[in-house]
């Protein structure tokens, strides 16, 4: 089994594909065939790719899953399909961003574009600026020869302010400010 990520409608319900499927946490789900965009249990190796099918809207759920059995990949991002899947744990927003950063660090040859999906503003590399609204997240993922770091913070209106531009350094400094 390998670690993957999957988006769900509320209550661990998958509605994309062949109708509606109800998953149960920590239980093995099995099917006969896996073919991306057709059949099987779909998941992504990069949690960020899950946002292509399910929005982070406060209702949908994003889980870490164990995937195995027969696995099919089609080269569309990190999407895969498998015949065995276990929903392991629902992810918080911070965990979701950290798991995405981990995927980025494990795939240094892959190119990632700065993006904004749902409440997440993500920039890759140094000397970038991000801003957002109250309740959204700012995330800098930096990987170079010296270090691999992820700085992710919610815009809380207290330490991290809405509408203000932050660099990775200023975001970290604002978060670490006493007060």
Predicted stretch roles:
Residues 1-179:
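Short, glycine-biased loop/turn motifs at secondary-structure junctions and
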């Amino acid at each position: 089994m390998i670690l993957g990520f999957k988006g769900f409608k509320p209550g661990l319900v998958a509605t994309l594909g062949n109708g509606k499927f109800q998953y149960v946490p920590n239980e093995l789900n099995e099917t006969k065939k896996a073919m991306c965009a057709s059949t099987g249990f779909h998941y992504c190796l990069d949690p960020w790719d899950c946002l292509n099918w399910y929005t982070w809207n406060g209702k949908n759920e994003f889980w870490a899953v164990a995937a195995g059995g027969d696995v099919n990949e089609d080269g569309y991002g990190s999407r895969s399909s498998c015949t065995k899947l276990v929903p392991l744990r629902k992810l918080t927003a911070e965990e979701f961003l950290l798991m995405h950063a981990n995927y980025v660090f494990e795939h240094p040859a892959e190119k990632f574009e700065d993006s904004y999906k749902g409440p997440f503003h993500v920039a890759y590399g140094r000397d970038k600026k991000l801003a957002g609204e109250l309740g959204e997240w700012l995330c800098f993922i930096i990987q170079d020869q010296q270090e691999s770091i992820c700085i992710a913070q919610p815009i809380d209106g207290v330490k991290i302010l809405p509408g203000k531009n932050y660099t990775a350094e200023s975001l970290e400094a604002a978060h670490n400010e006493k007060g």
